[in-house]
């Protein structure tokens, strides 16, 4: 497979994986919150890297997911005080967590792949050069990761489509039916965090 085709395929996989979640997030008026998550997960990546010293460790995904959920929790916590509106709360949490991550990167991760330019800008053009061998075939890691997160998102949405749909359009009905909308809310946010960190590795923030 040519480098150009590989890049296009990776871009398509990541785009579709993100758009699957994006539909529900727009319906819930959470597009700005997910923008915050896509940046604050950088802190989880950095902290996990400090622990493992490996850029390919699964702990990076776990750390990023936890920070993504922390972002949602902090935004809701600040909003519930009624001192500021949700958009202001998002701005506060985004600025604090993302700036901490950038400071840590610039100060403690010199001369390694985890640098500010790579994180903020990304470079999908290099994706074809990072490959994994499967059944004797060399396949770009971006294709494997993109396809994996696409399948994960598709499976979760397919299995819980009814529950997610009811939780979005009628929270009271969801509670009446015992569907626990908060569970599906954080499930959706977890998928957003995982999808974002996979995309981070390929195209940056």
Region annotations inferred by a language model:
Residues 1-17:
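Membrane-interfacial amphipathic/re-entrant helices at transmembrane-helix boundaries
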Residues 1-3, 20-30, 49-58, 165-175, ...:
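Short juxtamembrane and helix-loop transition motifs at transmembrane-helix boundaries
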Residues 1-6, 54-62, 83-86, 134-145:
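Interfacial loop-to-helix junctions that mark the boundaries of transmembrane helices
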Residues 8-13, 58-66, 89-92, 143-148, ...:
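Hydrophobic alpha-helical transmembrane segments
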Residues 12, 16-20, 66-73, 100, ...:
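Generic alpha-helical transmembrane segments of integral inner-membrane proteins
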Residues 23-113:
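Short loop segments and helix-boundary regions at transmembrane helix junctions
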Residues 100-156:
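Transmembrane helix-bundle core of multi-pass membrane transporters
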Residues 138-205:
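Helix-loop-helix "hairpin" substructures at the membrane interface of multi-pass membrane proteins
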